[in-house]
Amino acid sequence: MNVTVSMLDSVGAAGLVLWAVAMWAAVGVLAYANRGRVRPWVYQLSVGVIGLGVVGQFGHVQEHVAQVAYWIAHPNDKAWMTPLGTGLANGLGQVAPDKPSLGMEILHLTGNFIFLAGLVGVVLITRRALSTKARKWGRMGVLMQGIHGVEHLVLTLSVALGASQAIGLSTWFGLLEPGPGLWTYRIWWHFLANVVGSVIFAIAVYHLWCERRQVAAGYHRDVPRPRAPEPAAAAEHTPVPADPGAR
């Protein structure tokens, strides 16, 4: 099937991929820089990564909400995508025009990795505040979204490698025949995964806001304090009182 791809679709698709790559490059820098001495810029960059993750997931989850809304009205129809999602999928699908569903798989894979990077940002920024609730919820989100991300990676690779349909948990590993049963199962599987993940992310960000002073305090450079004299050194400089009986 020939699909006309506009310049806007191509630019949007390239921009989305660059967005994800930039976020993961930042995550790598943060993970390395946060291991040693305190670097205040790590805090600011982590906030930026989290913010981009929030924006990305806000758009991503809306696509799934729209799909479910369409399914409610047309439960026997093939999964629907918004015009924006369709355009981005068409742009991404140019990497392999002979695989019509690959663009859609890459789109959701990219969206999920943007989401995952935002959650990793929460874990990184709280590395010096281990007892915070934000860190607990952030780690929970990374675990769940990590599994979800692997699912999308498997779905994408299966299509890219020539499978007749995507293979993964959300397709019963390719055992479900294309039709209303498969479409319904996959639509709701990914909708619930994204909604639950988004709620966890929202709770993590909420606690991060409430605990922001505690988290930020870990990135303040300590002012060096004068060292207390060693006991032996102090004894050497202590004057010995004169013996009153000595002449």
Which residue stretches match the model-derived regions?
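Solvent-exposed, extramembrane regions of membrane proteins
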Residues: 241-243
